């Protein structure tokens, strides 16, 4: 999970929130009259008055009484309006430099203060969690409005809506796009205390998620058998899911282990799991009967209750406060989709539902049932048999990854070779590796973005005492994909405001490009898009779209029930998960009323992040289809870098520049239909 992009997206949403509680000063300035009278030197009817007036009007909308009088406002406009293209470009360069400095310093503070809680460097104390929840950017927006830098930015680089960017952007050059993205920096205003409260709630949820380990060696069947290694500890949901997926290979007790993990997941989402068994090796737990033993004696333990859902509710309450300051996008839903993803939630929902109800889903489900030789079960949403690695026993892969990567430094040393295996030139492979730091993670691992051209990207990965197991390696390769994109579209970009990609879904697509080539990076030969690879992406879309709908519908429910309790939210989420399951999954996988779709931990600490994954899968497939035309690994790497260097356009503009067509599920539906027809 690309946490830093989420944090920066949150910053953008916070910086684009305004007040309803303070009446704006009634100020304004007619530039047409000023041009006619000569009040502003260099301003005349031939200059870009419409764009300039737009900036003036947007400044006026955010000007408060404490910012000054009408006379002060007019003086401000006369002093700071860049009336010539040359002056405007110089100002843009200076603002860009300052923004990069601010972002870099804030990022470094966040990294260092968060080290004890996110890295595997000893047990963090309560004080560490307090420091990690500190938002070093919380006062940035306030400060920039107070010293008028925000107003200067708005005046000269006004904001354009998503619709305007998509309609006008086709005629913009790179500098105009960069100006437009500068216009996204300050659109409204929010108190620092509100943004800090959002950070604190999220940090608390992260702390809960990051230590939610299930001690697999202490899980019992009803007959008292143990199927997992004594020291196996799996983080929910990531490692539980990946262990379940690994059991599609020919390993002892594979089916029994899958059923047990599924039951554990059910107990977690229903909150029937005994609270004391989480991250605790002192108890043996039989998840099917929910009985617990300590030192061979059965004990009675209270369930977790509604703690899981309390974290969602806490974040909702902080977003409610944020809503009051955001009249343009007055809900977290609007800010997430229109503001961050740059697609409306209805647009995303329609895309997902169209996919979930396609004939191809049932046909591929039937294909999986034939391969498995049994009726499908709910956990078959994670069927892993379309990957070549699924026929290689995981213990063999784990033995290899542990030998190669006993620690984080070993993985880092091997990065240039991995990149060369993908076709990157030796010098570029070394450059990228030199700008990525690898660190041991406390949680599942993540990629932490470099936001300034004086710092590295950071790959946080989970490495056990015996070295990196295959699950950890696969996740690390995903995060490595994030890092390569992060370094490339920052260090090789033409304008700082265009650094990055359009949204989180796009960077997830870039990470998927690496993750599906994990064996190629390991040395198993070139991996290309074949029928199984297409089916694998298709089935991944099917799984994560349902999970995403549960997340989206949960937040719609919260806004419809703003006074909900944690227990009420728990019941609602379970109901939503079952309804989505019954409508889109039961016809394919069977089992009425399964709550499995509520298992993803993202719902707790990164609300509405999940839709980025299926959108990312859609983008990923379109990229794979495009990159398949490359005749060699070197051509693949060259084209990939060209796509990276487009930077942060809107999603549709970026996609058209990447592959020549907008974001669409049609290519993969057509490809899957062709595969089914030919089998």
Please place each PLM-identified region on the residue numbering.
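Active-site recognition of the HExxH zinc-binding catalytic motif
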Residues: 459-490, 511-512
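C-terminal, non-catalytic "cap/extension" segments appended to globular domains
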Residues: 22-292, 297, 319, 323-392, ...
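C-terminal motif of bacterial Sec signal peptides marking the signal peptidase cleavage site
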Residues: 15-16
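Alpha-helix capping and helix-loop boundary segments enriched in small/acidic/polar residues
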Residues: 446-447, 463-475, 497-506, 537-541, ...
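Sec-dependent signal peptide recognition
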Residues: 2-8
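Auxiliary, metal-adjacent structural segments of Zn-dependent hydrolase domains
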Residues: 393-455
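Post-HExxH zinc-binding segment in Zn-dependent metallohydrolases
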Residues: 314, 488-492, 496-539, 550, ...
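Feature representing long, continuous alpha-helical segments
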Residues: 482, 508-516, 544-552, 575, ...
